[in-house]
Curated annotation (Swiss-Prot):
Topology in the lipid bilayer: Peripheral membrane protein
Catalytic class of the enzyme: translocase
Keyword check for Plastid: yes
Name this protein carries in UniProt: ATP synthase subunit alpha, chloroplastic
Stated role: Produces ATP from ADP in the presence of a proton gradient across the membrane. The alpha chain is a regulatory subunit.
Lineage: Eukaryota, Rhodophyta, Bangiophyceae, Cyanidiales, Cyanidiaceae
Keywords: ATP synthesis, ATP-binding, CF(1), Chloroplast, Hydrogen ion transport, Ion transport, Membrane, Nucleotide-binding, Plastid, Thylakoid, Translocase, Transport
A GO molecular function held by the record: ADP binding
Organism field: Cyanidium caldarium (Red alga)
Broad class of the protein's primary localization: plastid
InterPro entries xrefs: ATP_synth_asu-like_sf (IPR023366), ATP_synth_asu_C (IPR000793), ATP_synth_asu_C_sf (IPR038376), ATP_synth_F1_a_nt-bd_dom (IPR033732), ATP_synth_F1_asu (IPR005294), ATPase_a/bsu_AS (IPR020003), ATPase_F1/V1/A1_a/bsu_N (IPR004100), ATPase_F1/V1/A1_a/bsu_N_sf (IPR036121)
Length: 504
């Protein structure tokens, strides 16, 4: 029998120890105590983060929202019908994130970024957190470039700048979505990436919007995120943050983006449902105490970045639905205080055939006027005041038996200006075509034209300027202002059109 040498044994043991590379995987696991109504109560999960993604035994994903002393309250991102009491849950160690990139353009996705348009899965290589901190004060610059909506009433009186948050507010069926979609359609020549987030809507309404964008060749630069009415409240709650993450990807690449949240009332209702089921204390209108933070952290992500960060921008157009025009309700007042202005749509104006049904008196843009082009400022400076005075006079004239000539003239001009601002859906007008229209109206050139023929006159005026004076539009595009020479050309064109069509 050969002698066993101790040094050989020790060297073999050392080699074995060095080769040993078994990694220990520690999993944070828990047990389902209770499940129902899209909520799960879980025992265990001691080292879980707030907002961490959880994976249930049957592969449903949830988000940990309530971290209590003896259990964790989680919301489910599916129906959760196969989750059983006593089944295991594990923490993923990840916060919700979404794949981003150029391959999302033209796609319709759900709130988790999965395609629902029947096309192949967009294999994204870049990922962004759904919840992300808004840019700080130093990272931003003031709003200085316009975002043209193509809607004359907005571009002239309530201008929106890149990086602004402008609320669209009104009752149901007053044309809020139409304004948002028209704005997307008008970005075709503007090189703006658009994200449309549909929250809690009927699938048929979303399909209609997608079809319209496709017909107008606008889907190629748009991403649609849809969390339909039949989907869990969790998905309706996170859909706006998913949209914001996609917009941020393009913004930090130096591009201009436009995001529409249609509508945040439904997101707040979904969040209220989740909070009440999680037994969080209810506040005003049964909303939880942090419902203001729900919207503020979302809308603060819209910004115009400084040049060091690439100069990109995210413009947000949140939509809020009111009940019987009540803008003093909880959610409307919250969002009005967060945003940089609001476009108020009136059901009375809508029913009177004035579309878009914008109530000029209480609509305002707090920062957009700095971004308005000089030519529009020159011609539209008095437009808002004229229309506000007209509304006041019109209300007064209903009770007055005889009116003096100056009042009659003011009423006549107001009616023509209002007619001028009427615009059919999905037919945006470029800002350069809006300028001659407003100039003609505000300077009294339409006062002697019958109201029912104003739209025809405007059409002929634009044709005349395009065909006979093509340099007119080119000069405005270059200089962004209406020079004395161009003003004379415009007056000449107006006189010609009036003469040819014998309007007087």
């Amino acid at each position: 029998m050969s002698n066993i040498r101790p040094d050989e044994i020790s060297s073999i043991l050392k080699q074995q120890i060095e080769r040993y590379n078994e990694s220990v995987k520690i999993e944070n696991t828990g047990t389902v105590l209770q499940v129902g109504d899209g909520i799960a109560r879980i025992y265990g999960l001691d080292n879980i983060m707030a907002g961490e993604l959880l994976e249930f035994e049957e592969k449903t994903i949830g988000i940990a929202l309530n971290l209590e002393t003896d259990n964790v309250g989680a919301v489910l991102m599916g129906d959760g019908r196969d989750i059983l009491e006593g089944s295991s849950v594990k923490g993923t160690g990840k916060i919700a994130q979404i794949g981003v990139g150029d391959n999302l353009l033209g796609r319709v996705l759900n709130a988790l970024g999965n395609p629902i348009d029947g096309k192949p899965n967009p294999n994204s290589t870049d990922y962004r957190l759904i919840e992300f901190n808004a840019p700080g004060i130093v990272s931003r610059r003031s709003v200085c470039e316009p975002i043209q909506t193509g809607i004359t009433a907005i571009d002239a009186m309530i201008p929106i700048g890149r990086g602004q948050r402008e609320l669209i507010i009104g009752d149901r069926q007053t044309g809020k979505t139409s304004i948002a979609l028209d704005t997307i359609i008008n970005q075709k020549e503007e090189n703006v990436i658009c994200i449309y987030v549909a929250i809690g809507q009927k699938a048929s309404s979303v399909a209609q919007a997608v079809t319209l964008l496709e017909e107008k060749d606008a889907l190629k630069y748009t991403v649609v995120i849809a969390a339909n009415a039949n989907e869990p409240a969790t998905l309706q709650y996170i859909a706006p943050y998913t949209g914001a993450a996609i917009a941020e990807h393009f913004m930090y690449k130096g591009l201009a983006t436009l995001i529409i949240y249609d509508d945040l009332t439904k997101q707040a209702q979904a969040y209220r449902q989740m909070s009440l089921l999680l037994k969080r204390p209810p506040g005003r209108e049964a909303y939880p105490g942090d419902v203001f933070y729900l919207h503020s952290r979302l809308l603060e992500r819209a910004a115009k970045l400084n040049n060091e960060l690439g100069g990109g921008s995210m413009t947000a157009l949140p939509i809020i639905e009111t009940q019987a025009g009540d803008v003093s309700a909880y959610i409307p007042t919250n969002v009005i205080s967060i945003t940089d202005g609001q476009i108020f749509l009136s059901s009375d104006l809508f029913n009177a055939g004035i579309r878009p049904s914008i109530n000029v008196g209480i609509s305002v843009s707090r920062v957009g006027s700095a971004a308005q082009i000089k030519a529009m400022k020159q011609v539209a400076g008095k437009l808002k005041l004229e229309l506000a005075q007209f509304d006041e006079l019109q209300a007064f004239s209903q009770f007055a038996s005889d009116l003096d000539k100056s009042t009659q003239a003011q009423l006549a001009r107001g009616q023509r200006l209002r007619e001028l601002l009427k615009q059919p859906q999905a037919s945006p007008i470029s800002v350069y075509e809006q300028i001659p229209m407003i100039y003609a109206g505000i300077n009294g050139f339409l006062d002697d034209i019958k109201i029912d023929r104003i739209s025809l006159f405007i059409k002929k005026l634009q044709e005349c300027l395009s065909n006979s004076y093509p340099h007119f539009y080119e000069a405005i595009k270059e200089s962004k202002q209406l020079s004395k020479e161009n003003e004379e050309v415009l007056k000449k064109a107006i006189t010609e059109v009036k003469k040819n069509l014998s309007f007087i």
